[in-house]
Every structure is written in structure tokens, then in C-alpha cells.
Amino acid sequence: MVSLSHYLVLGAVLFAIGVVGIFLNRKNVIILLMSIELMLLAVNINFVAFSYYLQDIAGQIFVFFILTVAAAEAAIGLAILVALFRNIRTINVDDLDRLKG
């Protein structure tokens, strides 16, 4: 039987992979977005695990809202990335300094 601690360890590992992805790849915008989405997924796993453990459906409902916001965030982030790539021809974070005064 899979216990609560298994889900919490899985969530912690996924969150740690996301944090490591952010710290190791600060130059590529796509990897930054993927790492943030992985961290959100880890939080969602913890919400569902605690919701199941406490026999409360509110955590699972909250996960649907988080997934909706995460999908919208990913779509907007990728749209901005495509627009920047068309203008600047790069996705390197260091080259995205046009708004600096």
C-alpha cells in the first residue's frame, strides 16, 4: 500500500528537480518555464495526497484551479517567448535586455 509519505517524497523530489533546473539553467527560457511547471506539479501532488489522507475534497478541487492557472501561465509564457524569438532571434535570457534604460 502506498502511504502518505511516499507521495510526499515524490512531491519533494519533483520540487527539488524543478529548483535545480532553475538554478542550473538560468539562460534558457524554455527550461525555466518547464522547471516552474514541474514545481507546480509537485505542489499539486502534495495537495492531492493531503486531501486524500484527510478525506477532504477541497484540496482536490483546489488542484483543478491551480492546473487551470498553470496552463494559462504556460500558454502566455510560450506566446511571449515566440514573439521575442521572432524579434530578437534568441531565447537566451541574457540577450533579453531591450527594456533596460
Swiss-Prot record:
Catalytic activity, reaction form: a quinone + NADH + 5 H(+)(in) = a quinol + NAD(+) + 4 H(+)(out)
Stated name of the protein: NADH-quinone oxidoreductase subunit K
Keyword field contains Ribosomal protein: no
Cysteine pairs bridged by disulfides in the record: none
Keyword line: Cell inner membrane, Cell membrane, Membrane, NAD, Quinone, Translocase, Transmembrane, Transmembrane helix, Transport, Ubiquinone
Bilayer topology term: Multi-pass membrane protein
Family: Belongs to the complex I subunit 4L family.
Subunit structure: NDH-1 is composed of 14 different subunits. Subunits NuoA, H, J, K, L, M, N constitute the membrane sector of the complex.
Gene Ontology molecular-function annotations: NADH:ubiquinone reductase (non-electrogenic) activity; quinone binding
Ranges annotated as spanning the membrane: 4-24, 30-50, 61-81
Entry's localization field: Cell inner membrane
One Pfam family this sequence matches: Oxidored_q2
GO cellular component terms, semicolon-separated: NADH dehydrogenase complex; plasma membrane
Enzyme Commission (EC) number: 7.1.1.-
GO biological process: ATP synthesis coupled electron transport
EC category name: translocase
PANTHER family xref list: NADH DEHYDROGENASE SUBUNIT 4L-RELATED, NADH-UBIQUINONE OXIDOREDUCTASE SUBUNIT ND4L
Domain of life: Bacteria
Coiled-coil blocks: none
Record-linked InterPro entries: NADH_UbQ_OxRdtase_chain4L/K (IPR001133), NUOK/Mnh_C1-like (IPR039428)
Function: NDH-1 shuttles electrons from NADH, via FMN and iron-sulfur (Fe-S) centers, to quinones in the respiratory chain. The immediate electron acceptor for the enzyme in this species is believed to be ubiquinone. Couples the redox reaction to proton translocation (for every two electrons transferred, four hydrogen ions are translocated across the cytoplasmic membrane), and thus conserves the redox energy in a proton gradient.
